[in-house]
Swiss-Prot record:
This is Annexin A2-A. Residues 2-25 are annotated as: P10 binding site. GO terms for biological process: positive regulation of receptor-mediated endocytosis involved in cholesterol transport. The keyword Metal-binding does not apply.
Length: 340
């Protein structure tokens, strides 16, 4: 029995350490002295209050980890016999509602629901499809596939196939499989050189593009390996990888390859650019802003903020302050986690 306790203790410790590593770069962390029952009761009261006490709902849901939010939803259902998502839908509206509903889904459920929304009805929101499929890790993609199957009783790949076509479809399907090699400790310089040369010979060097070769290399090799490949590529090609993509392919395929290369080179910078694009100029692309803030808040928001300030001269917090208002702004400020 003592041995079982020791093993469980070790597993718990390892789990906690991996969570700590993961959340060290996030802005939303697990709340200490967490009490799901107490939070569920406070949300119930906030919803019942005349005019709805949005502030209480925001402060609870943006200051708890995703696991804790799942516990709150469970406790809420046990207390009220109502689904927390339905209750929030009835009590909130607009962008604030979208943020809060996003926060109470598990991360795989959230990505799966965003992907489903991007493909249902007439036309496809390729931008959302590309962003999620290009930026998630093998493990995240596997979890998304499982959540998608559970939620929609169909396969993610099947929906991608029926909603896309040509080489763009091939690239999306290859990425969605989540078969990228994991990061190894050995640097294979011969393989780096070979891949760089093959990318050049399949594109800029020839008439027409061997897109299949690009897809194989860019969807199967590990991220650190590809970072070195793109660096080495410059010694073969007069253009860097992004410039080569712009010269060789067009439309959704071009957009997808560019997103992919940017994610491989520097994922926090990629998301900083997405956030900037969502807020620059007139009007706000709230869908992109909300998805990025919700999905990255526990993963790498601190890194994203750093890249944002470095590239755009002003903080992410400042941009959110300029572009949003009211309770919606407050929720995003909490997910942003402070000014730089």
């Amino acid at each position: 029995m003592a041995l079982i306790h020791e093993i469980l203790g070790k597993l718990s410790l390892e789990g906690n350490q991996s969570c700590a590593r993961q959340s060290a770069l996030g802005t939303v962390k697990a709340s200490t002295n967490f009490d799901a029952e107490k939070d569920a009761a406070a949300i119930e009261t906030a919803i019942k209050t005349k005019g709805v006490d949005e502030l209480t709902i925001i402060n609870i849901l943006t200051n708890r980890s995703n696991d804790q939010r799942q516990d709150i939803a469970f406790a809420y259902h046990r207390r009220t016999k109502k689904d927390l998502a339905s209750a929030l839908k009835g009590a909130l509206s607009g962008n604030l509602e979208t943020v809060m509903l996003g926060l109470i889904k598990t991360r795989p459920q959230y990505d799966a629901s965003e992907l489903k929304a991007s493909m249902k009805g007439l036309g496809t929101d390729e931008d959302t499809l590309i962003e999620i499929i290009c930026s998630r890790t093998n493990k995240e993609l596997l979890d998304i596939q499982n959540a998608y199957r559970e939620l929609y009783k169909t396969e993610l790949e099947k929906d991608i196939v029926s909603d896309t076509s040509g080489d763009f479809r091939k690239l999306m399907v290859a990425l969605a499989k989540g078969k990228r090699q994991e990061e190894g400790s050995v640097v294979d310089y011969e393989k780096i050189d070979q891949d760089a040369r093959e990318l050049y010979e399949a594109g800029v060097k020839r008439k027409g593009t061997d897109v299949g070769k690009w897809i194989t290399i860019m969807t199967e090799r590990s991220t650190p390996h590809l970072q070195k490949v793109f660096e080495r590529y410059k010694s073969y090609s007069p253009y860097d990888m992004e410039e080569s993509i712009k010269k060789e392919v067009k439309g959704d395929l071009e957009n997808a390859f560019l997103n992919l290369v940017q994610c491989i080179q520097n994922k926090p910078l990629y998301f900083a650019d997405r956030l900037y694009e969502s807020m620059k100029g007139r009007g706000t692309k709230d869908k992109i802003l909300i998805r990025t803030m919700v999905s990255r808040s526990e993963l790498d928001m601190l890194k994203i903020r750093k890249e944002f300030k470095k590239k755009y001269g002003k903080s992410l917090h400042y941009f959110i302050g300029q572009d949003t208002k009211g309770d919606y702004q407050r929720a995003l400020f909490n997910l942003c986690g402070g000014d730089d």
